[in-house]
């Protein structure tokens, strides 16, 4: 009986200790919109690599869950002419994810064409990546 309580106590401690780390990813990604808006490619690279290393997730795993003023990260970069950050985000995404419709049912390419961003540096990087 004592062993059962001991194992249960250890399991509860492990669960309590691991809970804060799940919430930390949100804190780590809290300022990513500002980083993209400021076109800070170096800081963006650090942020993405930190999240990848600490939480074992890739950009494509959390990309759809982040919105900046109602836009995804790449759309946000296009809207603010954050060319270096936008091109970096495109290089980090899988081609298949770049072709997926986003929340409004449009792909990044369709949205960029409709909003006049396809001819800019980020649009060019997108077209090059999509082949």
Where are these regions (language model features)?
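N-terminal signal peptide c-region/cleavage motif recognized by signal peptidases
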Residues: 18-22
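Conserved hydrophobic residue in the first alpha-helix
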Residues: 32, 73-74, 108-109
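Bacterial N-terminal signal peptides that target proteins for export
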Residues: 1-9
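Long, amphipathic, charge-rich alpha-helical segments that form helical bundles/coiled-coils
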Residues: 74-80
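Ankyrin repeat arrays, specifically the small/polar loop and inter-repeat linker segments at the C-terminal end
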Residues: 24-29, 41-68, 80-84, 88-131
């Amino acid at each position: 009986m004592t062993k059962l309580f001991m194992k249960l106590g250890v399991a509860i401690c492990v669960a309590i200790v691991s809970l804060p780390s799940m919430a930390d990813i949100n804190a780590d990604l809290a300022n990513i919109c500002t980083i993209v808006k400021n076109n800070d490619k170096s800081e963006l690279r650090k942020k993405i690599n930190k999240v990848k290393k600490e939480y074992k997730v890739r950009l494509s795993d959390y990309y759809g869950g982040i919105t900046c003023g109602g836009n995804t990260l790449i759309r946000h970069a296009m809207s603010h002419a954050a060319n270096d950050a936008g091109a970096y985000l495109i290089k980090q995404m899988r081609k298949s994810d770049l072709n997926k419709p986003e929340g409004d049912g449009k792909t990044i390419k369709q949205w960029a064409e409709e909003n006049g961003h396809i001819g800019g540096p980020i649009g060019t990087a997108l077209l090059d990546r999509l082949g």
